[in-house]
Curated annotation (Swiss-Prot):
Residues 306-316 have a biased composition (Polar residues). CDD domains: ascorbate_peroxidase (cd00691). The active site is at residues 50, 190. Binds 1 heme b (iron(II)-protoporphyrin IX) group per subunit. GO terms for molecular function: heme binding; metal ion binding; peroxidase activity. Keywords: Heme, Iron, Metal-binding, Oxidoreductase, Peroxidase. It is an enzyme of class 1 (oxidoreductase). GO terms for biological process: cellular response to oxidative stress; hydrogen peroxide catabolic process; response to reactive oxygen species. This is Putative heme-binding peroxidase. Heme b binds at residue 174. It comes from the Eukaryota. Destroys radicals which are normally produced within the cells and which are toxic to biological systems.
Amino acid sequence: MGIVDQPQSKGQESTPGDFAAVQKSIIDLLNQPDYDDGSAGPVLVRLAWHSSGTYDKVTDTGGSNGAGMRYEAEGGDPANAGLQNARVFLEPVKRLHPWITYSDLWTLAGVTAIHAMGGPEIDWLPGRTDFVDDSKLPPRGRLPDAAQGAEHIRHIFYRMGFNDREIVALSGAHNLGRCHTANSGFEGKWVNNPTRFSNQYFRLLLSETWTEKTIPESGLLQFSSVDQDTEEELMMLPTDIALTTDSEFSKYVQLYAKDKDVFFQDFKKAFAKLLELGIARNSEGKVINTDNQKGGYRSAPKKSDSTPATSGQPGASKTGGCPVMHHKAKL
């Protein structure tokens, strides 16, 4: 697949600290006609999410510092399958702005993409550092397993320090992107326009009739509905449906379905909080933690842990068929 390499073609390195220039380069790369729905935006949001969602508040390990997905132990986690694409998309930006760390670039790309796709402008602070080797990576098993229910969702998100309202707000990221059987075992998109940030995800959760569907290639169960207006099939994951069957989660689903502005405000705050997990700052906002210790809390093993990591030819592909990053990788 050809990658639209616009920032590199524009030639000139920016001044260190010019994050507006970095954002401009990210926006230039969002249009990817040969990739999912013509946009790199959703996978950049997922990269920011997964690079931050390893945090454990008890041990103060994991989080957005380090850019651990450059190494096989984290990048090769089946939960991160397909994110090689996001890293490949951003490599021209890194070459054009070599002064920015990968951990800052990945998180900045997420908030930039959300805003460019019609979402809220999310507060973001720089200063993250990159690991120099793979000795300080968080353990696998900390990211959500979409095949599970409400108990698992709380297990994962409470560990990071989120409450029920924040959990549902962050789930609204499923307004963007789609699932690929080759990556997660699930297939399809949640909403009609997966490159436009909105509250349609919540409205569809409540308005549609969701029926069970098994994906033949993976044997995983998801939920399906055919949109009456467009006649296209949409899907929901077990974790999505759990938001409607749990009484506490459900009240926030109903709130966000009715009021997009409230959802945007709550998502803005929750996503900013997510990107700061594991980051210690002084009164001036400067990052003062030097690393994240390896070890700490492990969540229950996920079903996807038995799935081999995706492999394929170098470069980004529609189905996430890039090789995983090995322990000396620089992407």
